[in-house]
Amino acid sequence: MDENSELGGLETMETLTELGDELTLGDIDEMLQFVSNQVGEFSDLFSEQLCSSFPGGGGGSGSGGTSNNSSGRGTSGGAADPAVQRSFSQVPLSTFSPSSTSPQAPALQVKVSPTPPRATPVLQPRPQPQPQPPAQLQQQTVMITPTFSTAPQTRIIQQPLIYQNAATSFQVLQPQVQSLVTSSQVQPVTIQQQVQTVQAQRVLTQTANGTLQTLAPATVQTVATPQVQQVPVLVQPQIIKTDSLVLTTLKTDGSPVMAAVQNPALTALTAPIQTAALQVPTLVGSNGAILTTMPVMMGQEKVPIKQVPGGVKQLEPPKEGERRTTHNIIEKRYRSSINDKIIELKDLVMGTDAKMHKSGVLRKAIDYIKYLQQVNHKLRQENMVLKLANQKNKLLKGIDLGSLVDSDVDLKIDDFNQNVLLMSPPASDSGSQAGFSPYSIDSEPGSPLLDDAKVKDEPDSPPVALGMVDRSRILLCVLTFLGLSFNPLTSLLQWGGAHNPDQHPYSGSGRNVLSLESGSGGWFDWMMPTLLLWLLNGVIVLSVFVKLLVHGEPVIRPHSRSSVTFWRHRKQADLDLAKGDFAAAAANLQTCLSVLGRALPTSRLDLACSLSWNVIRYSLQKLRLVRWLLKKVFQRWRATPATAAGFEDEAKSSARDAALAYHRLHQLHITGKLPAGSACSDVHMALCAVNLAECAEEKIPPSTLVEIHLTAAMGLKTRCGGKLGFLASYFLNRAQSLCGPEHSAVPDSLRWLCHPLGQKFFMERSWSIKSAAKDSLYCAQRNPADPIAQVHQAFCKHLLERAVEALVKPQAKKKAGDREEESCEFSSALEFLKLLHSFVDSVGFVASPFSSSSVLRSALGPDVVCRWWTSAITVAISWLQGDDAAVRSHFTEVERVPKALEVTESPLVKAVFYACRAMHASLSGKADGQQNSFCHCERASGHLWSSLNVSGTTSDPSLNHVVQLLTCDLLLSLRTTLWQKQASASQLLGETYHASGTELAGFQRDLGSLRRLAHSFRPAYRKVFLHEATVRLMAGASPTRTHQLLEHSLRRRTTQNTKHGEVDTWPGQRERATAILLACRHLPLSFLSSPGQRAVLLAEAARTLEKVGDRRSCSDCQQMIVKLGGGTAIAAS
């Protein structure tokens, strides 16, 4: 070999040389003890790696075995298994002759250049040496001179070190105690013949270029012969290609045993040897280079390495910190194993390309495990549903219902009790009574899910309680009707009377004496057959009623297994409704109906039969005679000892459960949460819910009964339209009658329907129920699956709109003498607001997961959003009326803006809020009160302009327009009031006040907002002329144009011969009175009529302002009248 190759191998061994200069064999023994202790503590960690090195258990065969690691990462074993070490140490030592060994084991010599002494380095990962071509691999040989020697004791020393660098490649270092560099002249040493333990060759992979880096630790064996000198042999780490790697074992007879390695992912080569001859595990490259370590015998005594001849120099004793190196290496290996598993977990859960830290990987893994558990739970439920459907099909073919939970379907009671916690939803109330299930709601009986004593092994129901199919009911009704129509009993009785033997004539020979028949029978003879006939018909009809309404109704026992199945799906449906999973809730509710024996119709024929039967049943239940007969039949069943006690209660409970299931399905259908079905299907579910709820009687709360009737009315109005509108009105009146004469039984959430305005809105207004309604700015969010809550939300917005419209565009009403007169603006608005405030106090906006009677009912509580708008409009009305105390009292509620409105960041809400603050600040008696009011007006004006510029569709456009008009009118009126106060103060001082540029700019901006709003909302025109005249007065403009604008508000108009929509643009009474005040106060005398006519106008304005309730303006008008009566000039300025 050339000198460059030798220098390249020397550079690779620098670190190993530095580590071995300062250690002794005593240190090696201490390290071995420490490692063996670590093996005892981490037995699981080392046993896995040991098994990968020694296939087949603890011992190995004579031939070397290979083991492939699927992960592609190399592992290094710790200490050898003690059992393996004992098995090797018990073999007696033998000797071999030099003649037999020398020719078969040729002398090998290691050519290594001398290395200068260097300081002891600290163990740390270093970059992997670049792989070199196989042709440049150096061949290392060791000269061996065998002699005979014996040793009473042997010791196995091995401790490989593994490091991992940042480039995802592995570096394998030699054990510290064996890392010594020999001189270029190797002295002969004695080699013991018996090799007791040969450490498995470690081959590490997963490098960037697909090569293997291997380093075989030297197996060292010591003997007690004092003449033996120890020479540690170091073999340089080599980089070889996996395609040319060959495993060979050198024997004493010279015949190598070769095993080709074909798998590039080879991670470990093991060669435990136990033979009489010397065997050395060797890796041979494609060019014949030997890349392995020869076992060398060492002395038994702890001879310091510094005393070994051969040019090894004495170094300083090892430092104390280096003794923990092995412990740190083990810890790093332990952490490396954990990191590998976390990486494998990441690849399984998120894929190989995902990047996430360890805690995130574990969190995702936990979430994925929970998801798999949920999927398993749903699959288990689907399996249960399919089994139930299979049993139902068998039931229709004549199989007993008791086979529903037979042992053939693997639903034994023991397995069910073990898995009930996984199949049942969590408890809704931790404080439930012991007699009820923790999974039941308070107002309904508990389900025996966890009580073994309650789950009976009896059949689900007696044969009579299985129920009849609706087709069978209709067939029986048709046969009964045909029987009563044709009445075959009449012909039967007549035939029996004709064949009476007493009336047969004598047919013998002779004469008969004529005689008269006596009429002793009288009227009873012809009445008796008729009475008997009707009696028989009545018995037949009564039997049919009993069969249909008593025996034909399916009833389940409270603690049967069918009841358990029903309650399990019922609770799951409640949870799905609370989570918003309406499709899953509908599936569970349909399963509940199937368990109850009331499956939904699947074909048109079944739907027609079911709908017809429910119409007939609802008609029969209204007959008092039928209800009395059914009650007597139930009492007879109760008194009969052969039947189960409480059959009537069980029947009512089953009817209640079925009614609630039908009711909730009906709610989901009419709110659009499920795929749209036919109108007949909705009517069918509504009638089923009503019929069964009335059959339940006292088992169902009155509030729930009212809710079921109202939902049926809504379903008929929305789905059937005008065709069956009278039925919607009938069910609405029926619901009101159930509330009692004083509406004592009606819940607070339904009280609005008992008000005349609520009834009128329900029947006349064109409201609609949407499946995905937009979030409203004026009402809090209601339960999306409750149609009554959605209609109530529409009614609240309707009342709010009516209240604001009464302020901005009051409607004219006709009295007896055909004299048109506007209604009082403020009183009508306050009436609507008071009614709205009473209705929003009892209806909430969040659906409760487990409410008292219905999951879909909104939780009780006030609608804080609608209440805030009510308070804001009340503050505006109070300020316009001049009621300062009411403004201050209601302003405290306006300051508390709900969080739902704060989140929206709506500019209209901010405009209303700052307008209310400006009105409140204008009432302050402080010096800076008017300035603060002006600042709030500026901020409100900016937000109002932003709300007008907002593009996009809103959920309530008409309500937005009236609120924007009211806010703009309030800001302009407030600015006018502030200007008049300053002008009045200047008049008292004898000065003339002119509005500043800032005041005029703010007024012009609000006036521009009013003009822009008038383009899309015509009622805003009635305010435009008045405020245009006001801004001209503030600016001191020409009074001619100002007088024309005021005349536009002063003229009276009639509604005759007017086009549609023009009435909305005419000024109202309040605008006319305000125009009179402005003209009399600010216009010159030349533009006004005589003083007598001026007094008439002021008196008329005073009456108008007093009627509408504007106290502030009315007081100003009366003061002007007083001044005019005293002879003071009104317009001296």
Curated annotation (Swiss-Prot):
Regulation of catalytic or functional activity: Activation by cleavage is down-regulated upon activation of SIRT3-dependent PRKAA1/AMPK-alpha signaling cascade which leads to inhibition of ATP-consuming lipogenesis to restore cellular energy balance.
Region (Leucine-zipper): 372-393
GO cellular component, one term: membrane
Region entry Transcriptional activation (acidic), spans: 1-50
One of the Pfam families matching this protein, by short name: HLH
Biased composition (Gly residues): 56-65
Annotated site (Cleavage): 460-461, 476-477, 514-515
Signal peptide: none
Domain annotation bHLH: ranges: 322-372
Region (Interaction with LMNA): 229-483
Lumenal topological domain residue ranges: 495-525
Low complexity: compositionally biased ranges: 92-109
Post-translational modification Phosphoserine, affected residues: 1090
Membrane-spanning ranges: 474-494, 526-546
Segments in the Cytoplasmic topological domain: 1-473, 547-1133
Post-translational modification, as annotated: Phosphorylated by AMPK, leading to suppress protein processing and nuclear translocation, and repress target gene expression.
Keywords: Activator, Cholesterol metabolism, Cytoplasmic vesicle, DNA-binding, Endoplasmic reticulum, Golgi apparatus, Isopeptide bond, Lipid metabolism, Membrane, Nucleus, Phosphoprotein, Steroid metabolism, Sterol metabolism, Transcription, Transcription regulation, Transmembrane, Transmembrane helix, Ubl conjugation
Span list, region Disordered: 56-136
Cross-link Glycyl lysine isopeptide (Lys-Gly) (interchain with G-Cter in SUMO2), where in sequence: 456
Family of this protein: Belongs to the SREBP family.
Stated name of the protein: Sterol regulatory element-binding protein 2
Species this protein is from: Rattus norvegicus (Rat)
